[in-house]
Swiss-Prot record:
Protein source organism: Anaeromyxobacter dehalogenans (strain 2CP-C)
GO molecular function terms listed in the Swiss-Prot or TrEMBL record: alkyl hydroperoxide reductase activity; disulfide oxidoreductase activity; hydroperoxide reductase activity; peroxiredoxin activity
Gene name, Swiss-Prot/TrEMBL: ahpD
GO terms, biological process: cell redox homeostasis; response to oxidative stress
Lineage: Bacteria, Pseudomonadati, Myxococcota, Myxococcia, Myxococcales
Catalytic reactions of this protein: N(6)-[(R)-dihydrolipoyl]-L-lysyl-[lipoyl-carrier protein] + a hydroperoxide = N(6)-[(R)-lipoyl]-L-lysyl-[lipoyl-carrier protein] + an alcohol + H2O
InterPro entries associated with the record: AhpD, AhpD-like, AhpD_core, CMD-like
Protein name: Alkyl hydroperoxide reductase AhpD
Length: 186
Protein backbone atom coordinates (compact mmCIF):
# COMPACT_ATOMS: atom_id res chain seq x y z
CA UNK A 1 0.00 0.00 0.00
CA UNK A 2 2.87 2.35 -0.79
CA UNK A 3 0.77 4.72 -2.90
CA UNK A 4 -1.91 4.95 -0.21
CA UNK A 5 0.73 5.52 2.46
CA UNK A 6 1.75 8.67 0.56
CA UNK A 7 -1.91 9.77 0.48
CA UNK A 8 -2.26 9.14 4.20
CA UNK A 9 0.80 11.29 4.88
CA UNK A 10 -0.68 14.10 2.77
CA UNK A 11 -3.84 14.30 4.87
CA UNK A 12 -3.95 17.31 7.20
CA UNK A 13 -4.14 17.06 10.99
CA UNK A 14 -7.92 17.73 11.05
CA UNK A 15 -8.27 14.46 9.09
CA UNK A 16 -6.17 12.34 11.46
CA UNK A 17 -9.04 9.90 12.01
CA UNK A 18 -9.41 9.45 8.26
CA UNK A 19 -5.66 8.80 7.96
CA UNK A 20 -5.90 6.00 10.53
CA UNK A 21 -9.15 4.61 9.14
CA UNK A 22 -7.80 4.53 5.57
CA UNK A 23 -5.14 2.09 6.68
CA UNK A 24 -7.46 0.05 8.90
CA UNK A 25 -10.36 -0.58 6.50
CA UNK A 26 -8.12 -2.00 3.78
CA UNK A 27 -6.58 -4.65 6.02
CA UNK A 28 -7.65 -8.28 5.49
CA UNK A 29 -11.02 -9.13 7.02
CA UNK A 30 -14.29 -10.69 5.88
CA UNK A 31 -13.91 -9.37 2.31
CA UNK A 32 -11.80 -11.14 -0.30
CA UNK A 33 -8.93 -9.07 -1.75
CA UNK A 34 -10.98 -8.63 -4.95
CA UNK A 35 -13.97 -7.34 -2.97
CA UNK A 36 -11.87 -5.08 -0.75
CA UNK A 37 -9.85 -3.50 -3.55
CA UNK A 38 -12.77 -3.42 -5.98
CA UNK A 39 -14.85 -1.44 -3.49
CA UNK A 40 -11.91 0.90 -2.87
CA UNK A 41 -11.40 1.51 -6.61
CA UNK A 42 -15.11 1.97 -7.34
CA UNK A 43 -15.67 4.39 -4.49
CA UNK A 44 -12.48 6.34 -5.22
CA UNK A 45 -13.69 6.79 -8.80
CA UNK A 46 -17.08 7.90 -7.47
CA UNK A 47 -15.40 10.39 -5.12
CA UNK A 48 -13.76 12.05 -8.16
CA UNK A 49 -10.41 12.86 -6.60
CA UNK A 50 -7.74 12.09 -9.20
CA UNK A 51 -4.90 11.85 -6.69
CA UNK A 52 -6.76 9.40 -4.47
CA UNK A 53 -7.98 7.33 -7.42
CA UNK A 54 -4.45 7.09 -8.86
CA UNK A 55 -3.07 5.87 -5.52
CA UNK A 56 -5.83 3.32 -4.98
CA UNK A 57 -5.49 2.08 -8.57
CA UNK A 58 -1.73 1.65 -8.13
CA UNK A 59 -2.13 -0.39 -4.96
CA UNK A 60 -5.14 -2.34 -6.27
CA UNK A 61 -3.34 -3.35 -9.46
CA UNK A 62 -0.62 -4.90 -7.31
CA UNK A 63 -3.21 -6.97 -5.42
CA UNK A 64 -5.95 -8.07 -7.86
CA UNK A 65 -6.54 -9.13 -11.44
CA UNK A 66 -7.12 -6.42 -14.09
CA UNK A 67 -10.72 -7.64 -14.58
CA UNK A 68 -11.53 -6.66 -10.98
CA UNK A 69 -10.20 -3.14 -11.53
CA UNK A 70 -12.13 -2.87 -14.82
CA UNK A 71 -15.34 -3.99 -13.11
CA UNK A 72 -14.83 -1.53 -10.26
CA UNK A 73 -14.36 1.37 -12.67
CA UNK A 74 -17.37 0.21 -14.69
CA UNK A 75 -19.47 0.02 -11.52
CA UNK A 76 -18.56 3.62 -10.67
CA UNK A 77 -19.52 4.78 -14.17
CA UNK A 78 -22.79 2.85 -14.40
CA UNK A 79 -23.83 3.85 -10.89
CA UNK A 80 -23.10 7.52 -11.64
CA UNK A 81 -25.94 7.23 -14.15
CA UNK A 82 -28.22 4.86 -12.26
CA UNK A 83 -27.95 6.60 -8.90
CA UNK A 84 -29.13 9.89 -10.39
CA UNK A 85 -31.94 8.25 -12.34
CA UNK A 86 -33.28 5.97 -9.60
CA UNK A 87 -32.76 8.54 -6.85
CA UNK A 88 -34.91 10.96 -8.88
CA UNK A 89 -37.66 8.36 -9.26
CA UNK A 90 -37.57 7.65 -5.54
CA UNK A 91 -37.42 11.30 -4.47
CA UNK A 92 -40.20 12.56 -6.71
CA UNK A 93 -42.48 9.83 -5.37
CA UNK A 94 -44.85 9.72 -8.33
CA UNK A 95 -45.89 6.23 -9.45
CA UNK A 96 -46.06 7.45 -13.05
CA UNK A 97 -42.25 7.87 -13.19
CA UNK A 98 -41.67 4.45 -11.66
CA UNK A 99 -43.84 2.86 -14.33
CA UNK A 100 -41.76 4.30 -17.17
CA UNK A 101 -38.97 2.10 -18.54
CA UNK A 102 -35.47 3.41 -17.80
CA UNK A 103 -34.25 2.78 -21.36
CA UNK A 104 -30.66 3.13 -20.14
CA UNK A 105 -27.97 0.65 -21.16
CA UNK A 106 -26.58 -1.29 -18.20
CA UNK A 107 -25.02 -4.33 -19.88
CA UNK A 108 -21.98 -4.40 -17.58
CA UNK A 109 -24.28 -5.12 -14.63
CA UNK A 110 -25.35 -8.32 -16.36
CA UNK A 111 -21.96 -9.29 -17.83
CA UNK A 112 -19.08 -8.12 -15.65
CA UNK A 113 -15.52 -9.07 -16.57
CA UNK A 114 -15.01 -10.93 -13.26
CA UNK A 115 -17.54 -11.84 -10.57
CA UNK A 116 -21.18 -10.76 -10.91
CA UNK A 117 -21.64 -10.82 -7.14
CA UNK A 118 -18.54 -8.69 -6.57
CA UNK A 119 -19.74 -6.22 -9.23
CA UNK A 120 -23.01 -5.91 -7.31
CA UNK A 121 -21.04 -5.26 -4.12
CA UNK A 122 -19.05 -2.50 -5.87
CA UNK A 123 -22.33 -1.01 -7.12
CA UNK A 124 -23.77 -1.15 -3.60
CA UNK A 125 -20.77 0.72 -2.18
CA UNK A 126 -20.93 3.41 -4.87
CA UNK A 127 -24.67 3.75 -4.34
CA UNK A 128 -24.06 4.33 -0.63
CA UNK A 129 -21.57 7.09 -1.47
CA UNK A 130 -24.00 8.63 -3.95
CA UNK A 131 -26.95 8.38 -1.56
CA UNK A 132 -29.36 6.39 -3.71
CA UNK A 133 -31.64 4.52 -1.31
CA UNK A 134 -33.35 2.55 -4.07
CA UNK A 135 -30.03 1.32 -5.47
CA UNK A 136 -28.60 0.57 -2.02
CA UNK A 137 -31.62 -1.58 -1.16
CA UNK A 138 -31.62 -3.34 -4.52
CA UNK A 139 -27.90 -4.19 -4.57
CA UNK A 140 -27.88 -5.18 -0.88
CA UNK A 141 -30.71 -7.63 -1.54
CA UNK A 142 -28.83 -9.14 -4.50
CA UNK A 143 -25.51 -9.56 -2.68
CA UNK A 144 -27.00 -10.96 0.52
CA UNK A 145 -29.25 -13.23 -1.54
CA UNK A 146 -26.15 -14.39 -3.40
CA UNK A 147 -24.35 -15.41 -0.23
CA UNK A 148 -22.45 -12.27 0.78
CA UNK A 149 -22.73 -11.87 4.55
CA UNK A 150 -23.96 -8.74 6.29
CA UNK A 151 -20.47 -8.45 7.81
CA UNK A 152 -19.04 -8.29 4.30
CA UNK A 153 -21.61 -5.68 3.24
CA UNK A 154 -20.83 -3.70 6.39
CA UNK A 155 -17.09 -3.77 5.63
CA UNK A 156 -17.70 -2.70 2.04
CA UNK A 157 -19.69 0.32 3.20
CA UNK A 158 -17.02 1.14 5.81
CA UNK A 159 -14.44 1.21 3.00
CA UNK A 160 -16.76 3.38 0.91
CA UNK A 161 -17.23 5.84 3.77
CA UNK A 162 -13.51 6.14 4.50
CA UNK A 163 -12.48 6.43 0.85
CA UNK A 164 -15.06 9.18 0.35
CA UNK A 165 -13.83 10.95 3.49
CA UNK A 166 -10.22 10.67 2.25
CA UNK A 167 -11.21 12.43 -0.98
CA UNK A 168 -12.76 15.26 1.03
CA UNK A 169 -9.75 15.39 3.36
CA UNK A 170 -7.37 15.71 0.40
CA UNK A 171 -9.34 18.73 -0.72
CA UNK A 172 -9.03 20.14 2.81
CA UNK A 173 -5.27 19.59 2.74
CA UNK A 174 -4.88 22.35 0.15
CA UNK A 175 -6.96 24.72 2.23
CA UNK A 176 -5.39 23.87 5.57
CA UNK A 177 -1.93 24.84 4.31
CA UNK A 178 -3.03 28.19 2.89
CA UNK A 179 -3.41 31.11 5.29
CA UNK A 180 -6.91 32.48 5.57
CA UNK A 181 -7.73 35.82 3.97
CA UNK A 182 -8.52 37.27 7.40
CA UNK A 183 -5.16 36.22 8.82
CA UNK A 184 -3.31 37.60 5.79
CA UNK A 185 -5.16 40.93 6.05
CA UNK A 186 -4.45 41.25 9.81
Amino acid sequence: MAALDAIREALPEPARDIKLNLQAVLQPGPLTPAQRWGVAVATAAAARNERLLAAILADARAEVEPAVVEDALAAAAVMAMNNVYYRFRHMVGKPSYSEKPARLRMNRLVKPAASKLDFELFALAVSAVNGCETCVRSHEQVVVGGGVSEDQVHDAVRIAAVVHAAAVALELAGHAAAPSAAAAAG
